[in-house]
A protein has these predicted regions:
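Accessory carbohydrate-binding/adhesion or oligomerization-edge regions at the termini
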Residues: 19-73, 77, 96, 151-155, ...
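Accessory beta-strand-rich segments of carbohydrate-active enzymes
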Residues: 28-30, 39-42, 81, 86-194
Length: 195
């Protein structure tokens, strides 16, 4: 009898484990680091959707353009940026969002951009983030083309010589995430604080 009961319980457990789940993910965080375009220098047209970025360098994030430059004591920032160049640069990325996700909310999160970044999605201005050490995010939902191509453009302005007292680099130097949630969800406030 004990053997029959044990076998029945094992069989029931296996059937429950194999049953399809009706659970859906409430929050999906996508690694958004791959396939960005980059160009050093500045031009306001670079924020536009139809701007031709085909000649730009393709790279993956995180990226620091200062460390790629030449070590020269003559740069205006001098020792404050380790004798490496600063300046202005642009990043762009083209991506698609499925039509089926029309009822979802999309947020882009930057874990760190040095410094003074401005962000556009499909030519629409999302905002400016001064400095460069804090995580920040923008809601993309009402500006996305569901079922079509979307273009995000990021202008990074690290042209203020000596903005720091140590080497800080330039660019999107930390991870970027595309976060998809239901409209009704718990807001993520960016961490746990213990005092």
């Amino acid at each position: 009898m004990k053997l029959l009961l044990s076998l029945t319980l094992i069989l029931m457990g296996a059937l429950l484990k194999a049953a399809p789940s009706t659970e859906t993910k409430i929050r999906v965080t996508e690694d958004f680091n791959m396939g960005w375009k980059f160009l050093l220098g500045d031009s306001p047209e670079r924020r536009e959707v139809n701007y031709d970025d085909s000649q730009w360098r393709t790279l993956n994030l995180p990226h620091d353009w200062s460390i790629e430059g030449d070590y020269t004591p003559d740069f205006p920032a001098g020792k404050n940026n380790g004798f490496f160049p600063e300046g202005l640069g642009w990043y762009r990325k083209t991506f698609t969002v499925a039509k089926e996700d029309l009822n979802k909310q999309f947020v882009i999160q930057f874990d760190g951009v040095f410094m003074n970044s401005e962000v556009w999605i499909n030519g629409c201005y999302l905002g400016r983030r001064p400095y460069g050490y804090s995580t920040f995010r923008y809601d993309l939902t009402d500006k996305l083309k569901f079922g079509g191509e979307n273009v995000i453009a990021v202008r990074v302005d690290n042209s203020n010589p000596g903005a720091d007292r140590w080497y800080h680099g330039s660019g999107i130097y930390r991870n970027v995430h595309l976060i998809k949630t239901n409209y009704v969800h718990f807001r993520h406030n960016g961490g746990i604080y213990i005092t």
